[in-house]
Amino acid sequence: MTYQMKKQWLLAIPVCASLLFLSACQEKPAPSADANTPAAEQKNNASSTLIQGKVERIPLQKNQFCDDQGCTQYDLQTIKTNVPWIDEYFLQRIKKAVPTAFTNENKEAKADAEKVQGINQSTIYVRFISQNNNLATFMIYSYEYSAGAAHGMYHQEFVTFDLNKQKRLALSDILKPNTEATVAQALYEANANWLEQHNITPQKLQLSDNFYYGVNGLVFVYPLYEIAAYAEGMPELKLPYVSAKDVVKAEYLPSLPQYANP
């Protein structure tokens, strides 16, 4: 190697070292906060959650509870999903509805009274109904029969969760502010024939907080005896989505087709 080449090579070493030092000292870009933060990760997981559920019977120490008023036989079944907080919600609902089914206290009923009156029945089932993106709908079916009664009483309660917010949605959560009167009027007009046959005027019709998302509209469910006879079951009144789009918040409205103007 010539003296001139050695000189050029030695001069290049400090320059390369300086470049490496400057490169190492440059400020690295901050990590993106949208995908790595716990809150964002939890929201993304909720949005992509596909509910899987099966009905399971709740194990009880005794399926029959007795006190001075008689005996009640319980059949309690809940939903087991891949979302723990949903499972816990329904378990606590059932425990609150029938606390005696979970108590250790139990009395022997008088044999004569049991033969004459029979045994009361209490049934609760929870079922997974449907899911639309981040909205998951379940149904609580309950049946109560008092021994000696002409018939039992049943009820179906629909529960819709916003998986992103991890909360149950009330009617007030999905409606735009101050639209209740408009919704009631639209609901009456959409079901006018049936309501008129049952002598229900627009002034008498109240919105039910028991609702679910149907195929073609928002369905309001009413308890036994409230707007119809027992024999007709629990009436359902449908508000078509085409009417609901102006009163339901966009985030809680299913994706609708674009209809051509006539």
Model regions and ranges:
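Bacterial N-terminal signal peptides that target proteins for export
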Residues: 2-13
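Compositionally biased intrinsically disordered regions enriched in Thr/Gly
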Residues: 26-262
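C-terminal motif of bacterial Sec signal peptides marking the signal peptidase cleavage site
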Residues: 21-24
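Repetitive helical segments and hydrophobic/amphipathic motifs
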Residues: 16-17
